Amino acid sequence: MGNYRIAVLPGDGIGKEVTSGAVEVLKAVGIRFGHEFTFEYGLIGGAAIDEAGTPLPEETLRLCRESDAVLLGAVGGPKWDDNPPHLRPEKGLLAIRKQLDLYANLRPVVCYDSLVSASPLKPDLVQGVDFVIVRELTGGIYFGQPSGRVVENGEEKAVDTLLYKKEEIERIVRMAFILARGRKKKVTSVDKANVLSSSRLWREVAEEVAKQFPDVTLEHMLVDNAAMQLIRAPKQFDVIVTENMFGDILSDEASMLSGSLGMLPSASLSASGPSLYEPVHGSAPDIAGMNKANPIAAILSAAMMLRLSFGLTAEAEAVEHAVRQALDQGLRTADLAPSGGRIVSTNEMVEEIKTAVLDYTAIAQIMTVYA
């Protein structure tokens, strides 16, 4: 069977706990399906600043480039909030995206039937929600130049630049159409074309790409309307594609449809090298080390790795089935407590999912689907 080398970057806060859980589940996949996963660890974010003096050490970058895929935990925390801009933990995340050419961020948003009551929205709004946000990662206002703060004539000013090249827009929109073709065949392109020149270019390019996918429907939606529609009628969406900052904001909003940020995985795909997988949630320093963190987003990110980087579809389905089974049995970490069920620790949730992976059979999955 397969041999796969995975770079693990725990990062800060609960990143260490949730990546540890995902690694344990991947080890169970290896045992169940006969694969060998090799895990090698690197520093990123605040942990890297403390130990190496930089948010992304060269050793970490080298490790990632030599690996088949990257599993990331989370970066950041109040400890580093007063650092100068180049020594902020988030700079490590932005840098690794740029260095590995991680141009497409995929964030599935699914509301599990057993977690409908965990969402702050009415059950009839969220039950059956299943869409993907495709966020452009390497362009836009987070990377545009000039960027910074200056003092001119005694007045302090700050500037950021929202810049997109046509080819950057084209490749992310194309990715969205390819995804939609295998789903419900609808792409919603989100922009601010009534105000921003970059969004007008975005809309024009989306129209050009759409001509190559006549079987897929394209609609345009202004970002402010999209933010409202995600709450008003989330089931209308299939694939949402948008620029970097809009995607950053909308995906956090969409997380509440599933009940918790702790449920949302993500994949950041590279055009030429290893892709990176990480939970959408942050480092949550307030609960770090307390065995309270929800590991499911990290575990589902590992499932995305199995499917997208390694082509191991059955193995990914085994992990997803194990997560669904744990939730159906009423297990809940503290972030999901309002939905009822038995509150368990991080380690207990991981152990339950591991056991389900080891016991997994395709027949068991079929029986669950048709039960």
Swiss-Prot record:
It catalyses: (2R,3S)-3-isopropylmalate + NAD(+) = 4-methyl-2-oxopentanoate + CO2 + NADH. Mg(2+) binds at D224, D248, D252. Keywords: Amino-acid biosynthesis, Branched-chain amino acid biosynthesis, Cytoplasm, Leucine biosynthesis, Magnesium, Manganese, Metal-binding, NAD, Oxidoreductase. Its EC number is 1.1.1.85. One of its GO terms (cellular component) is cytosol. Catalyzes the oxidation of 3-carboxy-2-hydroxy-4-methylpentanoate (3-isopropylmalate) to 3-carboxy-4-methyl-2-oxopentanoate. The product decarboxylates to 4-methyl-2 oxopentanoate. This is 3-isopropylmalate dehydrogenase.
